[in-house]
């Protein structure tokens, strides 16, 4: 197992067996979670029954003795839906959020990048740079936008006789990157297929760029000496452009202050930024988008930052990074809503702060961070509603968290379709609680004369229940659809003025069909792909970036993976949470009665349903999957960890606190140790090798 040499392919026989086991366990867990939410007590052994279950026909329902007692207890003693936030809670949230913000924004990306450029209009069009005098052993850097063609480079001493033309590879996948003229690589047929060799050392006074065709969008070109210093361009001229359409070649050298010492992730796009951040740029300029395989909202957020700060690495990563920062208070509030203890809310926030996946995935300009935050918040508001009751609070007050949950559900789905997975979890939680409220009304009708609270519940369910269901149609159907459609406004603006008509709706619908067909028919292979059952164990981290030109003896890399202390502990914790649900409800013969922890049991199924809704659908996905698809499950395994330690605290306080301290120290220490892998910080290869714990684990 530790060699990680097994089950790399997601379609192995054992993978199917594990999938079947997972589905069976999940079905049983979902059943027991629903029973918990609906107010069921653990079943009792036959010999312990004093008498058969009592039933009643009043109200058209029948309740067991245990369910009657639960209904009576909550009608007389409603749940506490408040978080009980105090000054120290805000202080802890603020401190953790501030600390994480500093780490997240440090070396996030350059705040300067070329903003203007030169677009070729014809094949054979040339631009000549005059460096003023003959230069030796210099390199050529270039930065481009969205381009369709390539160009070649040649140098000359006198401006008349040029040397061999060298291809400067530059295509759609190389947009918004600083690139260096490098030695070409060749395919099996001897055809140049890329450039991954060392930088080419150039000599001469004149540098000529010759474009292969129209549409090559270069935003800046620079000659750089061996020490990384920019060599000033004394003059520049262009020829061969289509008459009347020639661009100003000075746009190629007008932002030389943006030229970096060397290309790195800090000044260039990497991994899927070439799709998502590029689409943000296209939205900002009302262009037709290249990437249409996911809903647009996350890319719209990026476009807003690009509008405000320009097309720079810092700008296109800002929205995702801010989202990662907001996850810290979000999980703190979610933990307080569920557990209502500062200690465990602080632990939850700290573990998320120290998680490597959270750090890496929110600093890259992809869309995955947005739905995760929105899913956390939509579960937060649903949990709040579940702790309320329209028997005890005014109806409109109970509808507020439902409305908020629906809004964030819409935002999650409009960011990425994984929000639909979470929506299923919300539905399970909502209807389970709604049925519980119905059961309470059944009990109240039979005992309405015993207490005014029973009379209110007996008379109130029909009207308030119907109003709640009607409101939920608006909150969880109409509102999300409206949000989803509104998120397409920037996409539609590329076609002209956006109007509400059948053509607009048809375009939105066709975009959904295109998305669905893409994911349904996707057939691809990838060395770093991994099946769902490997993610919790961090079997195969996902490689995002390696520096092309690191210093001698050093390396810079970015990998997506979890903090072992957080994920491996979280795996044990979520198994405990799922297993404990079964233990409390389906295995009574093993249960030793020691009293009941109501707050624990009410929080437990919410965590279980949240985790299963984020994770379980991936068991059924046959397409290529990666470890970052586990990201949405991470908040729930962290909450499970806090719940598990809290459960232990009730039985052995000293042991619980000792394990908590060990976990905190381990999580922080491992985050620091793995920080170079998570951040791209250039460090010695020796350190990276030391942290490469298993065979074929990390990449640098």
Regions found by a protein language model. Give the residues of each.
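Short acidic/glycine- and proline-prone juxtamembrane loop motifs at membrane-interface regions
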Residues: 316, 320, 357-370, 415-418
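Transmembrane helical bundles and short interhelical boundary loops of multi-pass, membrane-embedded
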Residues: 2-37, 41-49, 53, 57-92, ...
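Transmembrane-helix motifs of polytopic, lipid-linked glycan transferases
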Residues: 314, 318-339, 377-381, 580
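Aromatic, loop-rich ligand-recognition surfaces of beta-strand-rich domains
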Residues: 102-175, 183-270
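Transmembrane-helix signature of polytopic, membrane-embedded enzymes
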Residues: 331-354, 372-373, 391-397
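Short helix- or helix-capping micro-motifs
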Residues: 348-353, 360, 380, 409, ...
């Amino acid at each position: 197992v530790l060699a990680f040499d097994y089950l790399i392919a997601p379609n192995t026989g054992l993978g199917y067996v594990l999938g079947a086991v997972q589905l069976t366990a999940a079905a049983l867990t979902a059943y027991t979670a629903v029973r918990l939410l609906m107010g069921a007590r653990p079943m009792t052994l036959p010999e312990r029954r004093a008498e058969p279950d009592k039933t009643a026909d009043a109200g058209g329902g029948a309740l067991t003795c245990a369910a009657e007692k639960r209904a009576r207890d909550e009608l007389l003693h409603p749940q506490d839906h408040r978080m009980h936030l105090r000054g120290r809670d805000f202080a802890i949230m603020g401190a953790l959020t501030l600390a994480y913000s500093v780490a997240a924004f440090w070396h996030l990306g350059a705040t300067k990048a070329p903003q203007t450029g030169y677009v070729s209009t014809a094949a054979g069009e040339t631009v000549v740079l005059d460096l003023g005098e003959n230069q030796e052993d210099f390199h050529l850097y270039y930065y481009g936008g969205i381009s369709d063609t390539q160009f070649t480079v040649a140098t000359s001493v006198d401006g008349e006789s040029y040397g061999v033309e060298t291809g400067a590879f530059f295509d759609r996948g190389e947009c918004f990157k600083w690139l260096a003229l490098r030695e070409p690589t060749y395919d099996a047929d001897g055809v140049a297929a890329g450039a991954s060799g060392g930088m080419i050392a150039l000599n001469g006074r004149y540098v000529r760029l010759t474009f292969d065709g129209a549409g090559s969008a270069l935003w800046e070109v620079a000659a750089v000496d061996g020490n990384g210093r920019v060599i000033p361009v004394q003059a520049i001229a262009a020829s061969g452009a289509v008459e009347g359409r020639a661009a100003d070649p000075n746009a190629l050298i007008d932002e030389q202050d943006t030229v970096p010492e060397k290309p790195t992730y800090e000044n260039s796009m990497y991994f899927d930024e070439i799709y998502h951040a590029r689409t943000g740029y296209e939205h900002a300029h009302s262009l037709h988008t290249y990437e249409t395989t996911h809903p647009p909202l996350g890319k719209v957020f990026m476009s807003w930052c690009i509008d405000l700060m320009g097309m720079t690495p810092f700008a296109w990563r800002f929205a995702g990074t801010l989202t990662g920062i907001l996850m810290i208070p979000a999980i703190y509030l979610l933990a307080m809503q569920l557990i209502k203890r500062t200690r465990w809310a602080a632990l939850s926030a700290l573990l998320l702060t120290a998680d490597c996946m959270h750090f890496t995935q929110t600093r890259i300009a992809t869309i995955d961070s947005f739905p995760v935050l929105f899913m956390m918040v939509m579960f937060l508001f649903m949990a709040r509603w579940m702790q309320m009751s329209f028997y005890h609070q005014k109806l409109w007050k109970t509808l507020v968290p439902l409305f908020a949950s629906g809004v964030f559900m819409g935002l999650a789905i409009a960011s990425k379709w994984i929000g639909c997975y979470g929506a299923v979890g919300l539905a399970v939680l909502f209807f389970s609680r709604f049925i519980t409220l119905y059961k309470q009304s059944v009990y109240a009708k039979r005992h309405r004369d015993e207490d005014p609270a029973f009379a209110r519940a007996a008379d109130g369910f029909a009207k308030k229940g119907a109003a709640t269901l009607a409101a939920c149609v608006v909150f969880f159907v109409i509102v999300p659809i409206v949000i989803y459609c509104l998120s397409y406004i920037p996409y539609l603006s590329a076609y002209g003025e956006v109007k509400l008509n059948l053509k607009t709706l048809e375009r939105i619908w066709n975009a959904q069909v295109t998305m669905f067909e893409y994911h349904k028919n996707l057939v691809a292979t990838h060395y770093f792909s991994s099946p769902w059952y490997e993610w919790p164990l961090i079997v195969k981290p996902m490689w995002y970036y390696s520096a092309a030109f690191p210093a001698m003896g050093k390396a810079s890399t970015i990998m997506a993976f979890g903090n072992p202390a957080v994920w491996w502990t979280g795996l044990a914790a979520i198994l405990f949470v799922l297993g404990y649900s079964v233990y409390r409800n389906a295995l009574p013969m093993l249960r030793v009665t020691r009293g009941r922890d109501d707050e624990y049991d009410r929080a437990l199924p919410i965590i279980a349903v949240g985790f299963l809704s984020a994770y379980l659908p991936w068991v059924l996905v046959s397409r290529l999957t990666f470890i970052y698809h586990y990201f949405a499950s991470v908040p729930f395994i962290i909450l499970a960890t806090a719940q598990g330690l809290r459960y232990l605290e009730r039985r052995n306080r000293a042991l619980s606190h000792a394990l908590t301290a060990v976990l905190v120290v381990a999580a922080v220490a491992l985050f620091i140790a793995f920080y170079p892998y998570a951040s791209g910080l250039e460090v010695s290869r020796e350190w990276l090798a030391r942290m490469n714990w298993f065979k074929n684990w990390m990449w640098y």
